[in-house]
């Protein structure tokens, strides 16, 4: 199950992603995400804290865990899960890498769950890829007036 969402999420969104990932992990479902800020990191943490499997797909080489604040989380994923990248070691994350990473995120999950996505969010690229691949896409309801929930609920 791929879990994606806004890098500018609310506390509710992060708690929800972590709890959802933990419940998936408890049920033996591998959690896939991108190791980015907010929803991605919360998803990996939730899966790991539940002693489940998680796959982190990077937009950089596997030796450059970005953001730097997720280095320890990334190291834990290496020990207890799988860190994956199509980019060569030493290659930093670049803006044009994110859509390529999102394609892999969509392909690896049997379905995609969106937890908060602001208008014009890159998350929607993952959703498009998932739909093209015939994957189910689910959106977690957020506060209807929150900007972070705008495209997740429409």
Please give the residue ranges for each predicted region:
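Glycine-biased, small-residue-rich flexible motifs in mid-sequence functional cores and linkers
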Residues: 1-154
